[in-house]
Amino acid sequence: MSRYIYIILFSLALLSSCANLGGGPQGGPRDTIPPIVEKESPINGTLNFDAKRIEIHFDEYIQLNDIQKNVLISPPQQKAPEIKAIGKTLSVVFAEELTDSTTYTIDFGSAICDYNEKTPLLEYVYSFSTGDVIDSLAISGRVYDAGNLDPIAGVLVGIHTNSADSALNTIPFVRITRTDDNGYFTIHNMRSGKYRLFALNDISRDYLYQPGEAIAFADSIVEPYIEKREQLDTIWRDTIGIDPETKDTLFTRQ
């Protein structure tokens, strides 16, 4: 089984709201099928990536929903790329130079929706590498509220290779993700190594710790790895986890 890191944030309350969009007269069955990717240029998983622009073509007209909140680029960039939807095409234009020999991941979250019903395309991730390989390790876990132990949705989770405490205030995370509605997270496309793991209520959206933001951090170094434990019909199934010596506790910083 995969090992999980359980992260507890101190005194963090996140509010969520929902609206009933089903009231009023109905014009027929609601289209619940999300947009389908028909073509990617360059293709998803490209190696030695050197393009400035990505275009993704869909089978229907699309629109974008709150890209600042829903789209995460890892490693994070200081200058946000320009992301637009025109007709059936989504474009991403980078505003800064990409780092050599680095795996990049664009997680669109629920940002891509069909034009009429706003049905989101979930779990669509575009990855590429500016080097010869796409890093493929990962760390998974869950974030809880320290006050009531409820799972927390929408919290930024990131890793650092720099062990200095000042890195939190001065250096953006190496890789990032957000917790889902049930507090679960997975940081994908990690390279092997030793990392410090953090959960951050990133109110400022700068991928840095600022005074007043709730934060939690692991009390030991984490090392991602891939285990092969289950054998089904002579084919091994990979499971992703963390070093068994890694403790599952995090402390909070106020």
Segments predicted by a language model, with ranges:
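Positively charged n-region of N-terminal signal peptides that target proteins for export
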Residues: M1-I5
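Bacterial N-terminal signal peptides
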Residues: Y6-S17
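Residue-level marker of motif borders
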Residues: L12, A199-N201
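Acidic, low-complexity Ser/Thr/Gly/Pro-rich repeat segments typical of extracellular/periplasmic
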Residues: C18-N182, T186-N189, K194-F198, G212-A218, ...
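Acidic, glycine-anchored loop motifs typical of Ca2+
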Residues: D202-P211
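Post-kinase regulatory C-tail/linker adjacent to protein kinase catalytic domains
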Residues: A218-D219, D233-I235
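Long, low-complexity intrinsically disordered regulatory regions
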Residues: E230-Q231, D238
